[in-house]
Amino acid sequence: MRRRQLLALSVLAPFALVACEGPEPEASSGGSGSAAPNFTYSPKGYDGVTIELDRPVERIAADFYSAAGLAQYGIKPVAVFGFGQNESPGKSFDSTGVEVVGTDMELDIEALAVTEPDILVAYGNEKGDGWTWWDEKVKGQVAELVDFVPVKLSDQTPDDMFAQYAAIARALGKDTESGDIADERKAFEDARKRVREVAAKKSGLTVLLANFSAEMNYTSKTLGIAEMLREDGLDLVGPDSSDDSSWAEVSWEKMSDYPADVLLVHDASVDYEDNPVFKRLPAVEAGQLGTWDDKRAYTYDGYAKWLNELAEVLEGAKQIVEK
């Protein structure tokens, strides 16, 4: 059993050391259910990886997105780090009262050690032995402090991600089937049903998922969120991505080659609104626009809200592109 020590460790380049101050929160079980007498978890997608502790888990560190995914089960971490802190409300984790030990690719190892987490839950790398953006040095430093619990991100649909966080919550002794989470899950399922129903009624409607920027644009038909929309009956258009990426690059000169009845603009898109090519896209001229974001935290309420917004766009859309 690993015991955390307050080591004077620091993360050097390529990570910047950040100072984290403030009150140290206690991990909160919240909700119904009690902490499991010990912790055993075998994460999906990581064959042969099992995390075992011979004691209950009381203190959890997590990346912002995993903190959000677990918060819906009444789990509050003692420390958070990583990407997502500055996302809009409902898309990430509200870190009020929680120690922030790093943002983006920064991590303060010493500050993490002070919070004494029992486990650290975050998007896992290929082996599942560290955060997907850590280098070997940082991964080793963290491994000296705390057991890492990976969440597989690549090739996962939203349903897959929800299932992973539910499995971690169950391993922590949480009730994942009743109470508020059951209501939130039903709202998500109802929103997906609404999308499926409008997709069935408007089977000829085409949809393009795009992330715009001043120099280059990116589209996807194979990201997990895109797979969910395809499962629900949407006809996604756009270029095929390469074998090693879920994204396809599309220059502004080529954007008109992929017309769509409905255009979903990624929330991270920048410097595109005044581009004359954008203004001439059929969906833009028709005002048939919506949003999407593959970086949205995997919470049922957040996804339900977005899916209902999407359904409203689809319900008001017409087929404007000739086949």
Segments from the language model and where they lie:
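Extracytoplasmic substrate-binding proteins
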Residues: 140-211, 303-323
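Bacterial lipoprotein signal-peptidase II cleavage site
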Residues: 20-32
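Extracytoplasmic ligand-binding site segments that recognize negatively charged/polar headgroups
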Residues: 86-88, 126-137, 150-169, 204-227, ...
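N-terminal secretory signal peptides and thylakoid transit peptides that target proteins
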Residues: 1-12
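Structured C-terminal subdomain patch of bacterial secreted/periplasmic proteins
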Residues: 144, 254-323
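Basic- and aromatic-lined ligand-binding clefts that recognize polyanionic substrates
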Residues: 59-73, 175-235
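A short, structured surface patch at a secondary-structure boundary
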Residues: 59-115, 119, 124-131
